[in-house]
UniProtKB/Swiss-Prot annotation:
Pfam families: GatC. It is a multi-pass membrane protein. This is Uncharacterized protein MG098. The lineage of its organism: Bacteria, Bacillati, Mycoplasmatota, Mycoplasmoidales, Mycoplasmoidaceae. Keywords: Cell membrane, Membrane, Transmembrane, Transmembrane helix. GO terms for biological process: glutaminyl-tRNAGln biosynthesis via transamidation; regulation of translational fidelity. It comes from the Bacteria. It is found in: Cell membrane. Gene3D superfamilies: 1.10.1760.20. In the C-terminal section; belongs to the GatC family. PANTHER family: GLUTAMYL-TRNA(GLN) AMIDOTRANSFERASE SUBUNIT C, MITOCHONDRIAL.
């Protein structure tokens, strides 16, 4: 039975890390290159991989860098020197905290800004905390920023698809592909480095040993890889389940081409109400966070960082592999808990970047994203309460937002808006003559929001007679 022995010098381990960085970096560059070629071929445009430089974007990047550095400094101050000693003795823990906000920067602003912010965060943290500088940790942060930026590129790429249902499915497939690819890369690299560091024979079984009193245990390399595989499969299954929940929840409540979201429900005061929702984006946010947390955990925290932990601490490579595996659930949950609410708050910045990328090569007067399709259509829908939008208008509106649609897609788009306008027409025809206008809670509602009595407007009769011309924009009250 073979056991890992650190017979190879530390320089050999770091060489493996540099090779790993070079290979992953090259793969990302090749991906971006071919993606740009495909966009030129299919969409007749060249997408930028960085957002438009402006005061707001620069301020946000600087804020993320400052917050990442301050988190480390605050922890050092609160722990009374304990955290400082931990970060200096085991700098890999400091890097793990840094990487959380590096991911946010890359996801918001793309791989190029992700590289810059990652290197800046690591340098500043080392300077202000007095920690140990290691080029491997800088490279790990850079890879994390690039991986997060690739996720942003994937989301932008799928948003160019005309059919929303196809766009959602394409994003799921690409996200699942990234998770599975990260597992394959991690498996290959961990096995290769471990075999190189051990007196490996083809018939031997490599054993990883953890010796840190009072906890001592060992695990075979094969079992180690199986645990990583099971984790990746659980994540993939979770992503697929979320996709089906998204599809079921949106069933009969969305249009594939116009990308309208609406919801109908019965109420005592009227037959039904149609809501147009433009912020139903929880699926993309959750999938973003899960994919990013999984890929960075496997490719960076498990496959890459342990190499340089060995350099800075003197512990064996198998020791750090097992330490990272033990802390993997905590790191994964911490990523989701921290990144998701931050992305929820910064989503407008992210969507602003999508608008810039999606419209940069369009005419100068038109800078709209797919979400702006709704803001263009809504005034037309309201103004055509008793008319159907004609085909020519649909074509013009579609061309202002996206690439030219095929005749079949234009026909589908026209049919969708015919149905939408019919829904509005039904609302305008509702007879509310005998319905008393009031503020919430509704007097006849089966589930009132409050128990207090409704307040009736002084000019109720006038409101009833002019319920279709309310200046606030509502069709009916």
């Amino acid at each position: 039975m073979g056991e890992i022995k650190n017979t190879a010098p530390t320089s050999d381990i770091s060489t493996s890390g540099f090779i790993y960085f070079a290979v992953v970096f090259l793969i990302i560059i090749v991906y971006l290159f071919f993606k740009n070629i495909l966009f030129l071929f299919f969409f007749k445009r060249y997408p930028k991989n960085t957002p438009k430089i402006g005061v707001s974007n620069i301020t946000t990047i600087a804020m993320i860098i400052a917050v990442a550095v301050s988190v480390v400094l605050v922890l050092m101050a609160l722990a009374g020197g304990l955290t400082a000693a931990l970060f200096r003795g085991y700098p890999g823990f400091r890097v793990t905290l840094e990487l959380i906000l590096v991911k946010i920067s890359g996801l918001l602003f793309g791989p190029i800004i992700g590289i810059f912010s990652a290197a800046t965060i690591d340098f500043l943290t080392v300077i202000f905390s007095g920690g140990v500088f290691n080029i491997g940790y800088v490279l790990g942060a850079i890879l994390t920023g690039m991986i997060a930026g690739i996720l942003r590129e994937v989301l932008i790429s799928t948003s160019f698809l005309n059919n929303k249902t196809l766009s959602d499915f394409a994003y799921l497939v690409l996200s699942v592909g990234m998770v599975f690819a990260s597992f394959l890369v991690t498996q290959f690299f961990v096995i290769s480095v471990t075999q190189n560091l051990s007196a490996f024979q083809s018939n031997d079984q490599i054993v990883l040993r953890f010796n840190a009193s009072p906890l001592n245990f060992s695990i075979s390399l094969q079992r180690y890889v199986q645990i990583i595989f099971y984790f990746a499969m659980v994540v993939i299954i979770t992503m697929v389940v979320l996709y089906f929940v998204w599809i079921i929840k949106q069933k009969h409540f969305n249009y594939a081409y116009s990308k309208f979201f609406f919801r109908r429900y019965k109420h005592a005061n009227h037959q039904f109400t149609l809501f147009v929702l433009t912020k139903e984006n929880w699926f993309y946010l959750i999938l973003n966070v899960i994919t990013l947390a999984t890929t960075s955990l496997l490719m960076i925290n498990i496959a890459f960082i342990p190499i340089f932990d060995t350099q800075t601490t003197g512990q064996t490579y198998d020791f750090w592999l097992l330490v990272r595996l033990l802390f993997a659930p905590l790191i994964f949950l911490l990523d989701i808990i921290v990144i998701y609410p931050i992305l929820l708050l910064l989503t407008p910045i992210m969507l602003k970047g999508f608008k810039t990328v999606a419209s940069e090569t369009q005419t100068k007067g038109i800078k709209k994203s797919f979400s702006d399709m709704q803001s263009l259509i809504m005034p037309n829908v309201i103004s055509h309460k008793k008319q159907q939008l004609i085909r020519k208008e649909m074509q013009q509106l579609a061309k202002t937002i996206r690439i030219d649609l095929s005749d079949k897609e234009v026909d589908a788009l026209v049919e969708e808006f015919k149905e939408i306008t019919k829904s509005f027409n039904k609302v305008t025809k509702i007879d509310t003559t005998n319905v008393q206008p009031m503020y919430a809670p509704f007097e006849f509602s089966p589930t009132p929001l409050r128990k207090d009595k409704p307040v009736v407007d002084k000019h109720a009769k006038q409101l009833l007679n002019n319920c279709c011309e309310v200046k606030t924009g509502f069709v009916k009250v």
